[in-house]
Amino acid sequence: MEDWVNAHNYAIQTGDCSYAFKYVTEDTEEYGFYKYIEILYKNGGWAVDSLDSYQSESALFYDESKKIYRMKVRRIWSTEIYIESNGGITRKANTDTSDDTFYFLYTYSNGYWKIIDSKYENEL
């Protein structure tokens, strides 16, 4: 997970998501976020602060029936600020931490652990 977090934060800082894409599948929320970041930077925008840290809250668990792995994680973040090239600003603050803990679902493919989905405990 540490390699992905480094690639994730590098993407946010630079707009170069090529490394982060290796760790997610195209149908994930994370993939859509990276496409947004790429377009933001390509059009002259940028991100301020906005970096994440993830803390493992469980061991990696293999679900034999679904043939996928899952791990409970906590996203640690404070603020996100995205500045569009036209001057528009999107600000988010982590004022409600009740949704910071969830599960990443993984597969192992082509030498990488790939995030294939994220779900809250009640969605598993």
Feature locations, PLM:
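Core segments of small alpha/beta cavity-forming domains
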Residues: 1-50
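Short coil-to-beta-strand transition motifs
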Residues: 47-52, 96-99
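Short structured motifs
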Residues: 53-58, 101
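Amphipathic alpha-helical interaction segments
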Residues: 12-13, 54, 85, 121
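A mature extracytoplasmic/lumenal domain signature
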Residues: 24-27, 35, 52, 73-77, ...
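Exposed beta-sheet edge and beta->alpha loop/turn motif
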Residues: 62-124
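Short, mixed-charge, low-aromatic patches
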Residues: 29, 58-63
